[in-house]
Amino acid sequence: MSNDTGADGGAANPDLGPDADAAAGEGLELAQFAAGCFWSVELTYQRLPGVARTEVGFSQGHHHEPTYDDVCGQGTGHAEVVRVHYDPKACPYGVLLDVFWAKHRPTTLIRQGDEAGTQYRSGIYYYTAEQERVARESLEAKQEEWKEKIVTEILPARRFYPAEEYHQRYLEKGGQSAQKGCTDPIRRYG
């Protein structure tokens, strides 16, 4: 999958440009992860101390302002992602990566469990050169643990489109705890 934004840095198609949004507070940084259906991935990050905010949505595609139905239709190129606003002093990026690797199977190309489609691919989308370095080192270390080849893509974070409000904090709205440090098993649906 090409990540070429062209000579204009994505100006001709803003969806190919970088995610230029700011983190939700002073001292916070952003990270994006694709690891299958975003509902349970989001709840996992919500529970993590040092994470100030999570959002589910779509990134890495080429369709302007996609909806959930657009993305599920397979024509937009987007992945379902969780965008994490985190305090790197309280929760280093490496901890976010540990959660990412533990949450899904990074050796399946376009599926996680029963869910199939390019929107369910495995991806780490970085905002800084340091995030890229740590992500690539993390992938190399994880590859030593897997017999199958890891297919996780590591690319610059592109423009983020929030999913419809219905999807935000979906499992928490369905009664599952998002309390920091909670270790209750995550049920797939609320």
Swiss-Prot record:
It comes from the Eukaryota. Disulfide bonds: none annotated. Keywords: Cytoplasm, Oxidoreductase. GO terms for cellular component: cytoplasm; cytosol. It is an enzyme of class 1 (oxidoreductase). Residues 1-20 are annotated as: Disordered. Catalyzes the reduction of methionine sulfoxide (MetSO) to methionine in proteins. Plays a protective role against oxidative stress by restoring activity to proteins that have been inactivated by methionine oxidation. MSRA family specifically reduces the MetSO S-enantiomer. This is Peptide methionine sulfoxide reductase A2-2. It comes from Oryza sativa subsp. japonica (Rice). The gene is MSRA2-2.
